[in-house]
Amino acid sequence: MHKWILTWILPTLLYRSCFHIICLVGTISLACNDMTPEQMATNVNCSSPERHTRSYDYMEGGDIRVRRLFCRTQWYLRIDKRGKVKGTQEMKNNYNIMEIRTVAVGIVAIKGVESEFYLAMNKEGKLYAKKECNEDCNFKELILENHYNTYASAKWTHNGGEMFVALNQKGIPVRGKKTKKEQKTAHFLPMAIT
């Protein structure tokens, strides 16, 4: 008797399982419609624009982000209308709004939106601003485990070590020769414009 019941129950369970799988797959394909795998990945991985900006997708090239770069020393990076690079504690200052443009994988150029100057670093590690973008304006962007970013010159090094964009406790740029990735003077948080 048990054998007879099992032979009737087993096919029914198999048919029901197949039916449920077909319904599930059909529902998923209808929901995704004509999306490419890249579009589906974007929808799944990025529930908000802010999450997207903290991912590494933008490092692949061509992306432009408009942000305020807030240093861990409590200063916003600023490039004024004369091209002077320094820190400001005024959040609503238009000279601290930066356009971060990806120029290659992991390499960005930083431009002051209001001043239209690019952030640059010379071979001595001094930060300055330029109207025209060149190799001095390219920085390696790295997202650290503490969720801050660092920006090291893509062209210049000092004794084999990277030279970073940094602001000291008074908002004055630190020469790249005196910076290290671990120092909070070199840690920046790209903040969305509100």
Curated annotation (Swiss-Prot):
<dbReference type="GO" id="GO:0030324">
    <property type="term" value="P:lung development"/>
</dbReference>
<dbReference type="GO" id="GO:0050731">
    <property type="term" value="P:positive regulation of peptidyl-tyrosine phosphorylation"/>
</dbReference>
<dbReference type="GO" id="GO:0008083">
    <property type="term" value="F:growth factor activity"/>
</dbReference>
<dbReference type="GO" id="GO:0005111">
    <property type="term" value="F:type 2 fibroblast growth factor receptor binding"/>
</dbReference>
<dbReference type="GO" id="GO:2000288">
    <property type="term" value="P:positive regulation of myoblast proliferation"/>
</dbReference>
<dbReference type="GO" id="GO:0009611">
    <property type="term" value="P:response to wounding"/>
</dbReference>
<dbReference type="GO" id="GO:0050918">
    <property type="term" value="P:positive chemotaxis"/>
</dbReference>
<dbReference type="GO" id="GO:0007165">
    <property type="term" value="P:signal transduction"/>
</dbReference>
<dbReference type="GO" id="GO:0051450">
    <property type="term" value="P:myoblast proliferation"/>
</dbReference>
<dbReference type="GO" id="GO:0005737">
    <property type="term" value="C:cytoplasm"/>
</dbReference>
<dbReference type="GO" id="GO:0098794">
    <property type="term" value="C:postsynapse"/>
</dbReference>
<dbReference type="GO" id="GO:0051549">
    <property type="term" value="P:positive regulation of keratinocyte migration"/>
</dbReference>
<keyword id="KW-0358">Heparin-binding</keyword>
<dbReference type="GO" id="GO:0005794">
    <property type="term" value="C:Golgi apparatus"/>
</dbReference>
<dbReference type="GO" id="GO:0051781">
    <property type="term" value="P:positive regulation of cell division"/>
</dbReference>
<keyword id="KW-0732">Signal</keyword>
<keyword id="KW-0339">Growth factor</keyword>
<dbReference type="GO" id="GO:0008544">
    <property type="term" value="P:epidermis development"/>
</dbReference>
<dbReference type="GO" id="GO:0010838">
    <property type="term" value="P:positive regulation of keratinocyte proliferation"/>
</dbReference>
<dbReference type="GO" id="GO:0045893">
    <property type="term" value="P:positive regulation of DNA-templated transcription"/>
</dbReference>
<dbReference type="InterPro" id="IPR002209">
    <property type="entry name" value="Fibroblast_GF_fam"/>
</dbReference>
<dbReference type="GO" id="GO:0098982">
    <property type="term" value="C:GABA-ergic synapse"/>
</dbReference>
<dbReference type="GO" id="GO:0022008">
    <property type="term" value="P:neurogenesis"/>
</dbReference>
<dbReference type="GO" id="GO:0008543">
    <property type="term" value="P:fibroblast growth factor receptor signaling pathway"/>
</dbReference>
<feature type="glycosylation site" description="N-linked (GlcNAc...) asparagine">
    <location>
        <position position="45"/>
    </location>
</feature>
<comment type="similarity">
    <text>Belongs to the heparin-binding growth factors family.</text>
</comment>
<dbReference type="GO" id="GO:0030334">
    <property type="term" value="P:regulation of cell migration"/>
</dbReference>
<dbReference type="GO" id="GO:0001935">
    <property type="term" value="P:endothelial cell proliferation"/>
</dbReference>
<feature type="signal peptide">
    <location>
        <begin position="1"/>
        <end position="31"/>
    </location>
</feature>
<dbReference type="GO" id="GO:0060665">
    <property type="term" value="P:regulation of branching involved in salivary gland morphogenesis by mesenchymal-epithelial signaling"/>
</dbReference>
<keyword id="KW-0497">Mitogen</keyword>
<dbReference type="GO" id="GO:0030036">
    <property type="term" value="P:actin cytoskeleton organization"/>
</dbReference>
<comment type="subunit">
    <text>Interacts with FGFBP1. Interacts with FGFR2. Affinity between fibroblast growth factors (FGFs) and their receptors is increased by heparan sulfate glycosaminoglycans that function as coreceptors.</text>
</comment>
<protein>
    <recommendedName>
        <fullName>Fibroblast growth factor 7</fullName>
    </recommendedName>
</protein>
<keyword id="KW-0964">Secreted</keyword>
<dbReference type="GO" id="GO:0060501">
    <property type="term" value="P:positive regulation of epithelial cell proliferation involved in lung morphogenesis"/>
</dbReference>
<dbReference type="GO" id="GO:0042056">
    <property type="term" value="F:chemoattractant activity"/>
</dbReference>
<dbReference type="GO" id="GO:0060445">
    <property type="term" value="P:branching involved in salivary gland morphogenesis"/>
</dbReference>
<comment type="function">
    <text>Plays an important role in the regulation of embryonic development, cell proliferation and cell differentiation. Required for normal branching morphogenesis. Growth factor active on keratinocytes. Possible major paracrine effector of normal epithelial cell proliferation.</text>
</comment>
<dbReference type="GO" id="GO:0005615">
    <property type="term" value="C:extracellular space"/>
</dbReference>
<dbReference type="GO" id="GO:0001938">
    <property type="term" value="P:positive regulation of endothelial cell proliferation"/>
</dbReference>
<dbReference type="Pfam" id="PF00167">
    <property type="entry name" value="FGF"/>
</dbReference>
